[in-house]
């Protein structure tokens, strides 16, 4: 499954979007629960013809969350500029779904180092930890008034980002020839929310891949921050928002009307500012299937020649 891009008629100031297919906003009851069956051996355990793997453990500063980080390094020599590198959230599920067929495709381009940031569990997702790590504090809701998945503690994205950028990344990149101009971050759902928040808050990465970000779960205020960006501060960064078109019978769009208007305004403002951003539509894919499709697309994108994006905002200096 490949993404379909939507282009503006204005060159170098493009932001790709298709609001009729945009289904970022969903209510709690219309999301299918993730498959939480224990995982078996992954590609690191089985071995690959194209990559070799290592795993490292980390703990949060407060000692309450425990991480397992897999690093996959191509078996080919790094180019003179260094390997591209993609950090991927929900690393347990990523590693479970990564296969040698995809790694072969990557090896035919400029294969990236893959860093799958997961948790010390045999489950595909640590639901409590990711709910805290991937959500921004400013938009956190009063979860004690909610039940189910929304009763989980949230608002720890700043702490997790500091861990990722100051401890995890330096450790996994140690001894590797990395192209810092092709360093990317991918996340889905709450992970997509974290990527969008990181695009606003950090310049550590160059490419930000936000897949099906959970903006409709009380975090749509993040769009106000997006609208307020100063374009010159984002000239070195590239944002890709990835979303699946609603499938037949999917009623998520009925919950999106109010926020879709905000998204339309946000995208228009970004477009006018020349911010380097794209929207990739995945036809006929729902929220869950977007996990696989989006992480594969992000890997293929960062391994391609087009990964060295030029900033659209340079036009504003004329």
UniProtKB/Swiss-Prot annotation:
Impact noted for substituting residue 250 to N: Retains 72% of activity
One Pfam family recorded for the sequence: Esterase
SUBUNIT field: Monomer.
Protein name: Apo-salmochelin esterase
Mutagenesis / variant outcome for changing residue 253 to A: Retains 78% of activity
Domain-related comment: Contains a canonical alpha/beta-hydrolase fold with an atypical catalytic dyad.
Superkingdom: Bacteria
InterPro entries per UniProt: AB_hydrolase_fold, Esterase-like, Siderophore_Hydrolase_D
Organism: Escherichia coli O6:H1 (strain CFT073 / ATCC 700928 / UPEC)
Entry's Gene Ontology molecular function annotations: carboxylic ester hydrolase activity
Outcome (variant: residue 245 to E): Retains 84% of activity
Residues at the catalytic site: 189, 287
């Amino acid at each position: 499954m490949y993404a379909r891009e939507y282009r503006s008629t204005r060159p170098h100031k493009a932001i790709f979007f298709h609001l009729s297919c945009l289904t970022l906003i969903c209510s709690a009851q219309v999301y299918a629960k993730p498959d939480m069956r224990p995982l078996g051996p992954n590609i690191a355990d089985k071995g690959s013809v194209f990559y070799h793997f290592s795993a490292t453990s980390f703990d949060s500063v407060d000692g309450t969350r425990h991480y397992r980080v897999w690093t996959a390094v191509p078996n080919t020599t790094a180019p003179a500029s260094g390997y591209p590198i993609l950090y991927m959230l929900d690393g347990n599920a990523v590693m479970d779904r990564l296969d040698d067929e995809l790694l072969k495709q990557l090896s035919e381009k400029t294969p990236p180092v893959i860093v799958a940031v997961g948790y010390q569990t045999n489950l595909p997702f640590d639901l409590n930890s990711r709910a805290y790590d991937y959500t921004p504090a400013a938009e956190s809701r009063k979860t004690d008034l909610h039940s189910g998945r929304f009763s989980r503690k949230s608002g720890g994205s700043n702490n997790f980002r500091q861990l990722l950028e100051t401890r995890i990344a330096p450790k996994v990149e140690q001894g590797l020839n990395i192209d810092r101009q092709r360093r990317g971050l991918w996340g889905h759902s709450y992970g997509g929310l974290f990527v969008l928040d990181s695009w606003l808050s950090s310049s550590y990465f160059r490419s930000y891949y936000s897949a099906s970000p959970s903006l409709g779960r009380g975090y749509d205020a993040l769009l106000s921050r997006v609208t307020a960006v100063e374009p010159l501060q984002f000239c070195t960064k590239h944002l890709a928002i990835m979303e699946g078109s609603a499938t037949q019978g999917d009623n998520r769009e009925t919950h999106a009307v109010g926020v879709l208007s905000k998204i339309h305004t946000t995208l228009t403002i970004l477009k006018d500012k020349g911010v380097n951003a794209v929207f990739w539509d995945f036809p006929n894919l729902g929220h869950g299937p977007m996990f696989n499709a989006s992480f594969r697309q992000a890997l293929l994108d960062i391994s391609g020649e087009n990964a060295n994006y030029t900033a659209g905002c340079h036009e504003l200096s004329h």
